[in-house]
Curated annotation (Swiss-Prot):
HAMAP family the UniProt entry points to: DNA_mis_repair
Organism name: Edwardsiella ictaluri (strain 93-146)
The protein, known as: DNA mismatch repair protein MutL
Gene label: mutL
Keyword field: DNA damage, DNA repair
Residue ranges of the region described as Disordered: 336-392
Comp. bias intervals (Basic and acidic residues): 349-358
Pfam families given in the database record: DNA_mis_repair, HATPase_c_3, MutL_C
InterPro entries to which the protein is assigned, alphabetical: DNA_mismatch_repair_CS, DNA_mismatch_repair_MutL, DNA_mismatch_S5_2-like, HATPase_C_sf, MutL/Mlh/PMS, MutL/Mlh/Pms-like, MutL_C, MutL_C_dimsub
Length: 639
């Protein structure tokens, strides 16, 4: 058979094999076109599971008569025109294949009218050459696409369609995914003349939670942990389900990259890895997450149906998502470990009896939570949490057990000053409060703040917080506090620190002394959660403990090995102290009061001994009495 150019209809039918898998694929492509056209309302009519009719009507910008014929041509699009556009795609569609492919395997008509056009026009393609015919029609501003008798001319494809119920279930799932991607769009889905779904456009707040509950179910909303995380040009927000509620929620996984619904292995792996210590292998995590990334850093031109993407910095994206999910799960775990086991209540189902929430000491008193008329101070009532209790890990159980042993041995603190933990409801970032503070009778005498580091008043210099405690006011070094916290986090338990695998092993070039230290100190490195494999002049780094995930590992690990090669004492405590001292923040932005409150809360939880006897490098009490005396002297002189 000689080489020849395929007829347009046959070429489009071949392309349709990649783009049009089933009726749900048609719905996805057409609705994405409506979204790209700026529609705020989209009506979807389905008959017989999409095999008989798929009709998409929108109120978008519409298509002019001059361009209507081109809209059904292959490789015709208004969304990109240059290679630069292809490398920074911001629209959902860009290939210019969908309409041509769909029209080649169905009877497709498109009716459209833009704002500045007096009448509407209708286009349809027919014949072997797919010639486009245009005729006048009646239609409001917007576009309607009708797809009749899908796969009527490809019997083999039509034979592989499932039952009407199954095909409509796939369409319903596509509509759910789009409704989650765009809360500002009204979507209506009808099947055989009956309205099945109607998602009204909502703004921020409780209405957003109600729509989330309508799509994902009330159980997910009740156990959802709000997530917001940002690093440079990467940002992620959304909700992840508390691990103990996964069995009730079932399989629910929605992920979006720059507003595009996605099923990406890298993203799935990062989220699964974040849950690995909290879920069994057969239980998938539940989440609704939105990843925002510079369009130039992601290639969406990978799969014809645009289900997959390729990240230019895959490891960075993987670790970013992993860190964000791990952080929110750990914060919720710590918070719920100190709260009562009352089930969570979301914005969609509020508690019938509202309760105030007590702030931790460093955040200041919640003045609106005082009893209306009670002369005797009583202990604050525990607040409901947005995430149910999660079983703490071994390291948390042991350290919290030690803390409560100190509580039993110490004099009880006044009930009115007991702290309670609190986790924000879905839609707000998860925050963590500290545990009940340890009462120490001699703390105030020694200049320590008593049962906590006190309330953060302000930041008087970068890295220095001014706090108010029982004994007065004090300056707290946030840099030293962070070092103390990291040292505590890097102290390995009996079974060693948990090693967090890297997505891609890191190849490090080592000097002779560093290679020798790696060989002799392998047991210590294993205990610290560092998985280093010697390889001639190099070493492969496979895993690191969680506090080191965001570090510059190619620089830090060789420095650590040089330290081990020359150190006189090599044990876990000294190595943890060295790592804490050489830890560098990737974000050099100035400290905020919220960060100071969070840091001191974590330090009080993990290092209660520092609250009792703070080192001078951490806390410096301020003596305000000389200043007060001088003011009084000035007042007397002015009288």
């Amino acid at each position: 058979m000689p080489i020849q150019i395929l007829p347009p209809q046959l070429a489009n039918q071949i392309a349709a094999g990649e783009v049009v898998e089933r009726p749900a694929s048609v719905v996805k492509e057409l609705v994405e076109n409506s979204l790209d056209a700026g529609a705020t309302r989209i009506d979807i009519d389905i008959e017989r599971g999409g095999a008989k009719l798929i009709r998409i009507r929108d109120n978008g910008g519409g298509i002019g008569k001059a361009e209507l014929a081109l809209a059904l041509a292959r490789h015709a699009t208004s969304k990109i025109s240059t290679l630069d556009d292809l490398e920074a795609i911001v629209s959902l569609g860009f290939r210019g294949e969908a309409l041509a492919s769909i029209s080649s395997v169905s009877r497709l008509t498109m009716t459209s009218r833009p704002e500045g056009q007096a009448e509407a026009w209708q286009a349809y393609a027919e014949g072997r050459e797919m010639a486009v015919m245009v005729k006048p029609s009646a239609h409001p501003v917007g576009t309607t696409v009708e797809v009749l008798d899908l796969f009527y001319n490809t019997p083999a494809r039509r034979k592989f369609l499932r039952t009407e119920k199954t095909e409509f279930a796939h369409i319903d799932e596509v509509v759910r995914r789009i409704a989650l991607a765009r809360f500002d769009i009204t979507l209506t889905l009808q099947h055989n003349g009956k309205t099945v779904r109607q998602y009204r456009a909502v703004k921020e707040g409780d209405a957003r939670e109600r729509r989330l509950g309508a799509i994902c179910g009330p159980v997910f909303v009740q156990h959802a942990l709000a997530l917001t995380w940002r690093h440079d040009e990467l940002a992620i927000h959304g909700w992840v389900a508390a691990p103990q509620a996964i069995r009730q929620i079932g399989e629910l996984q929605y992920c979006y990259v720059n507003g595009r619904m996605m099923r990406d292995r890298l993203i799935t792996h990062a989220i699964r890895q974040a849950y690995q210590d909290r879920l069994s292998d057969e239980m998938p995590p539940a989440y609704v997450l939105y990843l925002e990334i510079d369009p130039r850093q992601v290639d969406v031109n990978v799969h014809p149906a645009k289900h997959e993407v390729r990240f230019h910095q895959a490891r960075l994206v993987h670790d970013f998502i992993y860190q964000a999910v791990v952080e929110v799960l750990q914060q919720a775990q710590v918070a719920s470990a100190h709260d009562d086991p009352t089930p969570a209540i979301s914005g969609a189902a509020r508690d019938e009896e509202p309760r105030g929430v007590e702030n931790r000491a460093s955040a200041g008193e919640n003045r609106f939570n005082r009893p209306a008329s009670s002369p005797v101070a009583s202990a604050p009532r525990p607040a409901h949490v947005a995430a149910p209790r999660m079983p703490a890990g071994d390291i948390f159980r042991r350290r919290e057990g030690e803390l409560y042993q100190r509580l039993l041995a110490a004099n009880p603190a006044p009930a009115a000053e007991t702290d309670s933990a609190f986790v924000a409801a879905p839609g707000a970032p998860v925050t963590v409060a500290g545990p009940p503070a340890v009462a120490v009778s001699t703390a105030a005498e020694n200049g320590a703040p008593g049962d906590s580091f006190g309330r953060v008043l302000t930041l008087c210099a970068d890295g220095v917080a001014l706090t108010e405690c029982r004994s007065g006011v004090a300056l707290v070094s946030l840099f030293h506090a962070r070092r103390c916290l990291l040292r505590a986090q890097l102290q390995p338990p009996d079974e060693g620190l948990k090693a967090q695998p890297l997505l891609v092993p890191l190849r490090l070039t080592l000097e002779a002394a560093e290679r020798q230290a790696l060989k002799t100190q392998q047991p210590l490195l294993q205990q610290m959660g560092l998985r280093l494999q010697p390889e001639r002049q190099h070493a492969l780094l496979h895993a690191v403990p969680l506090p080191l995930r965001q570090q510059n590992l190619p620089r830090l690990i060789p420095q650590m090995l040089r330290y081990l090669a020359t150190a006189s004492v090599c044990d876990a405590a000294s190595l943890a102290d060295w790592l804490a001292a050489h830890w560098h923040s990737a974000d050099e932005a100035p400290w905020t009061v919220a960060q100071a409150v969070q840091l001191l809360a974590d330090l009080e939880r993990l290092c209660p001994q520092l609250v009792q006897s703070p080192p001078r490098a951490l806390l410096q009490p301020l003596d305000l009495q000389p200043g007060v005396d001088r003011l009084r002297q000035e007042e007397q002189l002015n009288e």
